[in-house]
Structure formats: structure tokens, C-alpha cells
Design a protein with these regions (language model features):
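Extended alpha-helical scaffold regions
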Residues: 1-344
Length: 347
């Protein structure tokens, strides 16, 4: 709340409110960068984030909201985005996307160790996820947890889980596993998964041109790298052919791998390089590209858009390696012939 000495002056009250939001953003960014580059993921901290998100509606419940102007509302949205990025980073999706090593125990797996060694924190997380229907911001979290818990089920099918952990994952009604329920929840139309992901990838946090909120280029690229892991999670869990509409997913890929006008392209080109040198080797990560390539030329635009995005190049920042990789992929397109109607044959 505002001090009484400030509340009576609209100008100073607005400055105070803006400063308070900037402090929240600064603290969250410090926490994100610590977990991104320094600290190991913590299940207890993840549970704290989810509980904080529920209490504050992911930062949207602010005591001084009545004084917000357009800039303050934009900062408030960034607080929501930062909380989501912080929670997703604590889930270590990049490790969860890797192939499960044969015979490994859950506590020894880099992707599972935080949750496997702290069943109480995992249970706290699941309790919060049960409240997901109240806020579409939970959709990316449901998707992320589905990936990690699927991996935990895979490990548990070969190596017995610790009894307390197994009890946490036990399904009382003998229905689908928890990870399947979370995945179904994420894709429920009411959760607006693709709209929420679009909002995340277009957040000012990911822009380097405007230096939004004073964030550095490295911070913006770190958020984009975390989002890339979230993006690959979609096709890791659901084959693109089963999605009712591929266009929203193609949109997300283009926004992730293509720099916005004025943004620094070098770091984003590095994401394209990572895709062509590492991700392309995994069928699930390359499945969207393979799907649009098979559908070409009957469905023309998706492949063209992905080729443009994954080329990793810009007029002022060429990237020959990624362009070459993209051209090699296009060289294996089954056909570039289009079937013309009879009325156009003599044109």
C-alpha cells in the first residue's frame, strides 16, 4: 500500500507505483538468472512460485492497481511472464526432453532429481495445479509438468520409485496417469494454450530492441531459450498430425526462431544453429518440420514460413551455416509441383 504522505499526490503516487513494479521485476529477474545460470533447480522453490502465483494471480493482484496507467499494466503483464519463465526454468525442460538413460533411477536423473528427492514439494505443486481452471496462465505449466511427470513414469516403469514418491503419483480412480490428465488440461479449449504461449513469446521481456524494463540482451535471449524448450515440449507430447490446426504452432515457431525488427539477431541465430545441429536428430523435435514438408505443396505456406524462420539469417546478420542446413532440408521436399486447374492450362 502507498504511504499516506504519497497517496494524496497523484503524480508521486504514480511514480511510487511504477517503482514498486520495477522492483518486483528486478527481483524476479535476478532469481530467474540465478536458476538459469548458477543454481540447480529446486522443487521447494518451484512449489513456492506456484503458491505465490495462485495468491497473486501471477502478479496481477496488486494493491495499487487503481493507479495503474498503460505502462504499469505492461509491467504487470511482464511480472506474470517472469513468474512463468521462472517456474518453467525450475522444471529444467531441456533435460526433460533428452532420452531417458536406460536403467537410471529417478534421483540420479538430472531432469527428475529435484522432484524425485522431494515428494512433499511435488505434492504441493500438484495441489496448486489442481487450481489451474481458475487462470489460463497455468496452461504452460500444465504442459511442462506433463513432460516431466511422463519422464518420471518412464523411469518408474524400469526402476522402482521411492514409496513416498510412488504414492504421490498414484491415481486413486485407476484412470489416466497424472501426466496425461495434465496434458489434457493444458489442451482444454478453456485454457487457451496457444494464445497464452503467443502472449509469452511476444512479451517485452524477449525484445532486445526496446531494452524493455532495462533488461539486457542476454536476459532476453535466456527467456527465449527457455521458451524454446517449452515449444519443443508440445511435439514431444503430441504428434503434430493430431493437432486440429497447425497454424498456431507454426506461428509460435516463427516467433521463437525469428528476430523481431530491430532485435539483435545473433543470439536467435544461435537457437537456429542448435536446432539444426542437435534438435533435428530427435524425431519428436523435428516432427513439425517433417509434417509441413510432407504436406507441401498441398499446404504451401507453413513450409515457407518455417524455412524463413529457421534460416537464422537477417539482412544485417547473415548465418551461412543455418541457411545451408535449411536448403538441405528443402532439397528433400518430395515435390515442388502444383496441380493447376484446367482453366489455367492455356494461360
Amino acid at each position: 500500500m502507498l504511504p499516506s504522505s504519497v497517496a494524496g499526490d497523484t503524480h508521486y503516487a504514480s511514480l511510487w507505483v511504477r517503482h514498486g513494479l520495477e522492483r518486483q521485476l528486478a527481483l524476479l529477474e535476478v532469481a530467474f538468472l540465478l536458476y538459469y545460470g548458477r543454481l540447480s533447480p529446486s522443487a521447494a522453490f518451484l512449489a513456492d512460485i506456484l503458491e505465490c502465483g495462485h495468491r497473486t494471480q501471477f502478479g496481477q493482484r496488486q494493491a495499487n492497481a487503481s493507479l495503474f496507467d498503460a505502462d504499469a499494466h505492461a509491467k504487470c503483464r511482464c511480472i506474470r511472464d517472469l513468474l512463468l519463465f521462472l517456474a518453467i526454468e525450475c522444471l529444467n525442460l531441456e533435460a526433460a526432453l533428452d532420452v531417458v538413460p536406460e536403467g537410471i533411477a529417478a534421483p540420479d536423473d538430472a531432469a527428475l532429481a529435484p522432484l524425485a528427492t522431494d515428494p512433499d514439494a511435488l505434492e504441493r505443486c500438484l495441489v496448486q495445479l489442481e487450481k489451474a481452471a481458475s487462470d489460463v496462465a497455468y496452461a504452460p505449466l500444465l504442459l511442462s509438468f506433463a513432460l516431466v511427470l511422463r519422464r518420471l513414469d518412464e523411469v518408474g516403469s524400469h526402476t522402482p520409485l521411492e514409496p513416498r514418491l510412488a504414492a504421490t503419483l498414484d491415481v486413486v480412480d485407476h484412470g489416466p496417469q497424472i501426466w496425461r490428465r495434465l496434458l489434457q488440461g493444458a489442451f482444454d479449449p478453456s485454457m487457451q494454450l496457444f494464445d497464452t504461449l503467443h502472449s509469452l513469446v511476444t512479451s517485452p521481456l524477449l525484445r532486445t530492441a526496446t531494452r524493455a524494463l532495462g533488461a539486457s540482451n542476454l536476459s532476453a535471449l535466456a527467456y527465449r531459450a527457455v521458451f524454446k524448450g517449452l515449444l519443443l515440449t508440445i511435439t514431444e507430447l503430441v504428434q503434430p498430425e493430431y493437432l486440429p490446426d497447425l497454424d498456431p504452432l507454426v506461428d509460435l515457431w516463427c516467433l521463437t526462431f525469428r528476430a523481431m525488427p530491430g532485435d539483435v539477431p545473433d543470439g536467435i541465430a544461435a537457437l537456429c544453429t542448435q536446432f539444426w545441429t542437435q534438435d533435428i536428430q530427435y524425431p519428436t523435435r523435428a516432427s513439425l518440420l517433417e509434417t509441413v514438408r510432407r504436406r507441401f505443396p498441398a499446404s504451401f505456406l507453413p513450409l515457407v514460413r518455417l524455412a524463413h524462420a529457421l534460416s537464422g539469417t537477417a539482412p544485417d546478420a547473415p548465418s551461412p551455416d543455418t541457411v545451408t542446413a535449411m536448403m538441405n532440408a528443402l532439397a528433400h521436399v518430395p515435390s515442388v509441383a502444383l496441380i493447376l486447374p484446367l482453366s489455367l492450362i492455356h494461360i
